[in-house]
Amino acid sequence: MSNATTTNGKAPSQDVVAVIVGALAAMGYSADQIAHIRPIVSYNWKMEGRLRGNR
């Protein structure tokens, strides 16, 4: 969790970070493989998801 940084003026909640790391660990990822947890809205990611869903 040392890679957690402030985004949009707010520090990420430790509970939220713990849940995300736990979910990724349950999927087989180690904590060393997690580079960033960024709560940034990216409209490009949304559009890419929509385009992939239409395929």
From Swiss-Prot:
Disulfide bonds, paired cysteine numbers: none
Keywords, in A-Z order: Cell membrane, Ion transport, Membrane, Sodium, Sodium transport, Translocase, Transport
Protein's UniProt keywords contain rRNA-binding: no
Entry EC no(s): 7.2.4.3
Phenotype of gene-disrupted mutants: Deletion of the gene does not abolish methylmalonyl-CoA-decarboxylase or Na(+) transport activity, but it affects the stability of the complex, especially the binding of the alpha subunit. Mutant lacking this gene plus the 3'-terminal half of the mmdD gene lacks methylmalonyl-CoA decarboxylase activity.
Gene Ontology CC entries for this record: plasma membrane
Enzyme superclass (EC): translocase
Catalytic activity: (S)-methylmalonyl-CoA + Na(+)(in) + H(+)(out) = propanoyl-CoA + Na(+)(out) + CO2
Activity modulation: Completely inhibited by avidin.
Keyword Membrane: yes
Chief location: membrane
Lineage top rank: taxon: Bacteria
GO terms of biological process kind: sodium ion transport
Location(s), subcellular: Cell membrane
Quaternary data: The methylmalonyl-CoA decarboxylase is composed of five subunits: the carboxyltransferase alpha subunit (MmdA), the tunnel beta subunit (MmdB), the biotin-containing gamma subunit (MmdC), and the delta (MmdD) and epsilon (MmdE) subunits.
Function: Subunit of the sodium ion pump methylmalonyl-CoA decarboxylase, which converts the chemical energy of a decarboxylation reaction into an electrochemical gradient of Na(+) ions across the cytoplasmic membrane, thereby creating a sodium ion motive force that is used for ATP synthesis. The epsilon subunit seems not important for the catalysis of either decarboxylation or Na(+) transport, but it improves binding of the alpha subunit and plays an important role in stabilizing the methylmalonyl-CoA-decarboxylase enzyme complex. Can also convert malonyl-CoA into acetyl-CoA.
Protein name: Methylmalonyl-CoA decarboxylase subunit epsilon
Organism: Veillonella parvula
